[in-house]
Amino acid sequence: LLAAAAGAAAGDKCGRNEFQCRNGKCISYKWVCDGSSECQDGSDEWEQTCMSLTCKSDDFSCGGRLNRCIPGHWKCDGQQDCEDGSDELGCAPKTCSQDEFRCAEGACISRLFACDGEPDCPDGSDEASCAPSTCGPAHFRCNSSSCVPALWACDGEPDCDDGSDEWPARCGARPSPQPGRGPCSRHEFHCGSGECVHASWRCDGDADCRDGSDERDCAAATCRPDEFQCSDGTCIHGSRQCDQQQDCGDMSDEVGCVNVTLCEGPDKFKCHSGECISLDKVCNSARDCQDWSDEPIKECATNECMRGNGGCSHTCFDLRIGHECHCPKGYRLVDQRRCEDINECEDPDICSQLCVNLAGSYKCECRAGFQLDPHSQACKAVDSIAYLFFTNRHEVRKMTLDRSEYTSLIANLKNVVALDAEVASNRIYWSDLSQRKIYSAQIDGAHGFPAYDTVISSDLQAPDGLAVDWIHGHIYWTDSVLGTVSVADTRGFRRKTLFRQEGSKPRAIVVDPAHGFMYWTDWGVPAKIEKGGLNGVDVYSLVTEDIQWPNGITLDLSSGRLYWVDSKLHSISSIDVNGGNRKTVLEDEQRLAHPFSLAIFEDKVFWTDVINEAIFSANRLTGSDVHLVAENLLSPEDIVLFHNLTQPRGVNWCEKTALPNGGCQYLCLPAPQINSHSPKFTCACPDGTLLAADMRSCRTEADVILSTQRASTAARPQLTGSPAGTTQEPLTEPTLSTLETATTSQQALHNADGRGSEGTPRSVGALSVVLPIALLGLLCLGALVLWKNWRLRSVHSINFDNPVYQKTTEDEVHICRSQDGYTYPSRQMVSLEDDVA
């Protein structure tokens, strides 16, 4: 009765979404029957408790002892989610639709891919039994029988698999490039396959060109004195030999190693005199150590755990000599005696998304829109299907994650590289390196030949990276030739260069519009990963060490971590958005031979590899479970994951103000949210113009010059005619180039005035009148000075040792006073050379 009363009293304390343990403790219902016990008595995992649970109508019941419930669309998705695999039992065979081709091994591909000259089925059956292809009048027939548009022939870029569209027999001999005008700079090596790589990568033992030409005709490698030469001829640092890790490809660095770590393990005892004996020889009344340290009389006869538990907070374990304090699972020993709880949540990768620390353990939870997979403990999306969009040089393809089958989204492109999507508007954006343009198209109408719009068509050289700000309606892109990062609205009407640096080579870019930041890779010298505000302010480097050729970059918003691939180090790495907690997810020279781009969804990372011509996936937390997603792809480059959860909704502060576009005349750009006092947005003007004094409207440099001249002209009469308290509206200070232009203009005006006054007849008559008046004035002034000196001799003066000066209103100076509280103070360059001159 007492137990029942206590249980009833405790039951009143539990909420509607809580489960009451048998001992009265309250836990969340989502923790019941999840495979780990949160109740101290284990009642949340009892069989009778789990069998009493009922799944929702649209869920699937796994049955068994735990009777777990999973979303209904997880059944027959090719992934085992139930503990016993019952969700993948009794599934109907996969069927292909009418517009799909069924491969011999069962996979489905678009019929457009059958007999197109490229094997898309894993077994190549889509290219078997194909009739010889016939090219239309607007196409060129390659030597391999495939067809490419006739406009692509002899354009300097090989489009046929065998390069026959650029053979000299058809196109003629091409003139050799003049010195200094080649496609690569003097600090780069020109690969035989066309691309440019760092000159320092030539003959470094690692093929960086697609055709491996950077490693041809190289002298035999010799190792330095501080290096170890592997049996295959490669060199590693000497400290890596016998470090219990295989660093040589042939594992020769771990052959013939002698274990010098003696006296380690629970069955060993090290004497004070240096000998190592087995533990069973301690306290056996025999001298095994030279100094008798194995036979201390007092310690051998004492069980320290019998007195006060040996001072241990939890478990005391008696040894032959002394004792040890042990801690239960989930705790650690902090001072050889006391145990404290381990906060497992300090590891950012301990959980898929959210981590809840508990006494002695932890719990993983998921954000809204995701559900925890009871089998893999991964957070999986519960709503719409996720798609992978990737570029295949001449087209954009779409792949479903649950079937790994793809269709053509946009075909007949020249050299598509960068790609991104706007989920809410169902629109994709891409850049074409050959056309030097950025395009967009509606996904609904994209069935191989969609109508697409030209967004940016000028002032582009190599738009290698592209990112869409889905909250504020902007696109950001990089240009590795110009060394710039730029922004424009999604229609391309308004654009601005945000970042430009000599020698930089920005490549991939990703944005976080909710917090106002962008991140991009730069494989210039030195290589780095940069971070800056979406309005172009506060740019600094996040990663500068252990990085050589950073290519693709992506941001996992759910965990707040950046992931990037390094094509030189053959690795996938990650950091938090502030540059800390760096981790290497995966290193693999085979499957990361030349990674180009990557994407994140749920617990998987997907990447494209140019050399393997494939798409791979792996666990983003551990780097394990590497799978081949798609193969036989022609130059797969950018990859984007399309799902509504990858682009969560946010507030567009530029549209929340009373004035449209935030009151900005040109562009309203989100500002980085560094702290709670950060502005929500700032205004920006097109290249070659400046913000006006109101920090919202724009004006040209010519307007600045005229304003400067007017201010200097109006200032002269103010010295005598203006009241002391009068102030003028502050003007935006001109830049250095503006100052030089203003100086030149004023000098020209001065010269013009001088030329206009030369040779005037009136000047002679005026001079004859002014000179007598001036002489008379000087005589009067001299008489006045003599009279004042005579008066001062008869006046006694009083001197104050500590004079006090009263400040008047003429001394007030207002510096950088802004009329808009949501703007940054303008950064201007001041030159002292003009003052010195």
Swiss-Prot record:
Superkingdom, taxonomy of origin: Eukaryota
Region Required for MYLIP-triggered down-regulation of LDLR, residue ranges: 788-837
Locus of motif NPXY motif: 800-805
Post-translational modification Phosphothreonine, affected residues: T720
Region (Disordered): 709-731
GO MF annotations in UniProt: calcium ion binding; hormone binding
Sequence ranges on the Extracellular membrane side: 1-765
Subcellular locations according to the entry: Cell membrane; Membrane, Clathrin-coated pit; Golgi apparatus; Early endosome
LDL-receptor class B repeats: 384-425, 426-472, 473-515, 516-559, 560-602, 603-645
Disulfides per UniProt: C14-C26, C21-C39, C33-C50, C55-C69, C62-C82, C76-C91, C96-C108, C103-C121, C115-C130, C135-C147, C142-C160, C154-C171, C184-C196, C191-C209, C203-C218, C223-C235, C230-C248, C242-C257, C263-C276, C271-C289, C283-C300, C305-C316, C312-C325, C327-C339, C345-C355, C351-C364, C366-C379, C654-C668, C664-C683, C685-C698
Key words of the record: Cell membrane, Cholesterol metabolism, Coated pit, Disulfide bond, EGF-like domain, Endocytosis, Endosome, Glycoprotein, Golgi apparatus, LDL, Lipid metabolism, Lipid transport, Lysosome, Membrane, Phosphoprotein, Receptor, Repeat, Steroid metabolism, Sterol metabolism, Transmembrane, Transmembrane helix, Transport, Ubl conjugation
Parts of the chain that traverse the membrane: 766-787
Residues bearing glycans: N143, N259, N644
Bilayer topology term: Single-pass type I membrane protein
Processing and modification events after translation: N- and O-glycosylated.
Chain ranges on the Cytoplasmic side, renumbered to this chain: 788-837
Gene Ontology CC entries for this record: apical plasma membrane; cell surface; clathrin-coated pit; early endosome; Golgi apparatus; late endosome; low-density lipoprotein particle; lysosome
Family per similarity comment: Belongs to the LDLR family.
Assembly notes: Interacts (via NPXY motif) with DAB2 (via PID domain); the interaction is impaired by tyrosine phosphorylation of the NPXY motif. Interacts (via NPXY motif) with LDLRAP1 (via PID domain). Interacts with ARRB1. Interacts with SNX17. Interacts with the full-length immature form of PCSK9 (via C-terminus). Interacts with PGRMC1 and TMEM97; the interaction increases LDL internalization.
Function: Binds low density lipoprotein /LDL, the major cholesterol-carrying lipoprotein of plasma, and transports it into cells by endocytosis. In order to be internalized, the receptor-ligand complexes must first cluster into clathrin-coated pits. Forms a ternary complex with PGRMC1 and TMEM97 receptors which increases LDLR-mediated LDL internalization.
Name under which the protein is recorded: Low-density lipoprotein receptor
Name of the gene encoding the protein in the UniProt record: LDLR
